[in-house]
């Protein structure tokens, strides 16, 4: 009962559960990171964006990005009219799916290749509409939304 009251108050006031967002971002980020490392094979490139190409640097940078994007997601879905959908794992996963597609279209398709070129790395060009990247971002978004709802309870 206390959890239901807390959730209702959070929904009405637009309060963000930052800890839940961080945990959901880390969980979704680890799964996406495994796809980046083992399917796409580009985890070291993420570290190279910060001048230190390597697997560990790539993972650290990726998880920091995951948490940052999770905090933005939580801030967005904690506000009306989306807040009423963020409490159910199914609908929150749907919100996450849309968020994942948006991240792919902006961060992966435009920002990352631009950043790569700016730091002297070979760039796939803008926009980079890589379907593997789309799958990774959709997986991230769906897990982020679902985990955010489940962990908020």
Describe each PLM feature range.
Residues 109-133:
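Interfacial helix-loop-helix junctions of multi-pass membrane proteins
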Residues 51-64, 124-135:
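Short aromatic-rich membrane-water interface segments that cap or initiate transmembrane helices
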Residues 28-41:
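Alpha-helical transmembrane segments of multi-pass membrane proteins
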Residues 80-102:
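Cytoplasmic juxtamembrane regions at transmembrane-helix boundaries
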Residues 64-72, 136-148:
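Hydrophobic cores of alpha-helical transmembrane segments in multi-pass inner/ER membrane proteins
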Residues 40-53:
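Membrane-interface interhelical connector segments
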Residues 1-26, 85-89, 148-153:
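Haloarchaeal acidic low-complexity proteome signature biased toward cell-envelope/secretome components but also
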Residues 100-110, 134, 138:
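Mid-bilayer segments of alpha-helical transmembrane spans in multi-pass integral membrane proteins
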């Amino acid at each position: 009962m206390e959890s239901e009251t807390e959730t209702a108050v959070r929904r009405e006031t637009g309060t963000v559960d930052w800890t839940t967002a961080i945990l959901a971002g880390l969980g979704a980020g680890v799964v996406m990171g495994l796809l980046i490392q083992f399917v796409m094979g580009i985890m070291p490139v993420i570290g190279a964006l910060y001048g230190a190409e390597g697997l560990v640097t790539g993972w650290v940078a990726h998880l920091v990005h995951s948490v940052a994007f999770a905090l933005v997601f939580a801030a967005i879905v904690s506000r009306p009219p989306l807040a009423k959908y963020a409490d159910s794992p199914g609908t929150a996963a749907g919100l996450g799916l849309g968020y994942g597609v948006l991240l792919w279209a902006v961060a992966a398709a435009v920002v990352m290749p631009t950043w790569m070129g700016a730091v002297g790395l070979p760039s796939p060009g803008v926009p980079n509409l890589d379907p593997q990247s789309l799958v990774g971002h959709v997986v991230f978004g769906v897990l982020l939304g679902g985990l955010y709802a489940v962990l908020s309870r």
